Amino acid sequence: MKKSPGGNPTMQNRSKFYHRFKLPLSLLALFFLFVTACMKDEVFNDQENALPDQNVVSSDQELSSRSWHSPAMVNAWSQALEDMFTFPTNALSKGQPVTARIFAMYHLAIHDALNCITPKYARYVGVERDKDADPDAAVAQAAYDVIAVVKYPDQSMANMNALLATSLAGIPEGDAKDRGIALGHAVAAAILAQRAVDIPYIQLNYPNVPAEGDEPGEFRYIPPANYGLSGYHLMAPFIIASQDQFRTDPPYAVNSPEYTTDYNEVKTLGRAIGSLRTAEQTEIAVFWAEITNRKWNEIAQQVIASRPPQSMDAWKTARLLALMHAAIADANISSFDSKFYYYFWAPISSIRLGDTDGNDNTVGDPLWTALIPALPIGGYPGVHSEAGAAAGEVLIRFFDKDNYDLDLDCPFLPGVIRHFDTISDAVDEFTISKIYTGHNMRLATDAGEAVGYPLGDYVFENGLQ
């Protein structure tokens, strides 16, 4: 068993760190990971910008009648989605930003299905309530209906089909079950309609690609897509107020000493061939190279399992997972807003053009390639570090606790377990891993993490109350 390197922020240091987003950021940025997003055509009735439903009024008698309900069905369907996006069922071919939307919609459907029966928390969409519906039937059907539409075209529904059959078979026949199934259908349809306006923005080849830069530091096209997901920054957030609410401060100048330091770091540690990475640094790079939502769902499930059983009913569990995945989705949208706004180049461009960047202290390498191929998008800030910090903050705030014994695996590295004493430790290692993959300079990862924490805090304070 390996333990992550020391030097990660404590709770106090974490708080100081994420408030840095209000100050001038000092280092540079770049890239992010893989996507070949060919999205299935989704046809719904557009329902633009409908406000999340906030109706949580219910009688004390109604709440007490279902004061505790097992989270087993919620956890089973959350685990099923995690499995669906686990290598080899999902390798590097599924894009993180698009997948973040899938996880958020799926878990919001589960959350809303429950709260349309007994409204303990605010709902994301407005669906007519049915207090007599079976909760487990509603959860199973809502989750199934969402993933059946938003999954990637090459993903099989065989396991989801089997889980739906098993889930419904375990519920006694009768009116409550029928009502639960009908409610699940209705909630899923409302979620899908609410987010149907996203569809143009999740295409890899969105038509309005910005012009290629020609000055040092400006984004250079990366063939064949040139600039991928160039409309993603226009997608409406799930919880945060606007795409630019957590926009980062500008990156540093290309001719600055900080840029030189970060340039040389990612050039030597992030390259595919001839790297100076240690064996553990390479392990860290590969360990965190999977889909962000899958990894953080694994972490969330370990956190949930560590709680006293009676402290986590279906409603509370569903809310936690919905908030965390909504935070990850919003962090992706927020990061893409900053990427598009600053239009900063990625390491693969900055290093290959290092001899013509106006910095006498950088040496270019026209053959440089990152350890892991990355999506052709702006290099600042780091999207993974922003998403990881947002997810971590939701988990920390939800239980007001950072210290956990986390033992995480990786489908890319069978038999490898990495241990973390705190959620913050996991966030910190996730952040630095993107230097080792060759996706980001340190400023980009630091900037992403710095805004990810307050973004997660905002989601926790304002979402699904």
Give the ranges of each region predicted by the language model:
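Bacterial N-terminal signal peptides that target proteins for export
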Residues: 4-5, 10-25
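Sec-dependent N-terminal signal peptides
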Residues: 27-31
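C-terminal motif of bacterial Sec signal peptides marking the signal peptidase cleavage site
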Residues: 35-37
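Bacterial signal peptide processing site
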Residues: 39-41
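Acidic/polar surface patches and capping/hinge elements
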Residues: 44-465
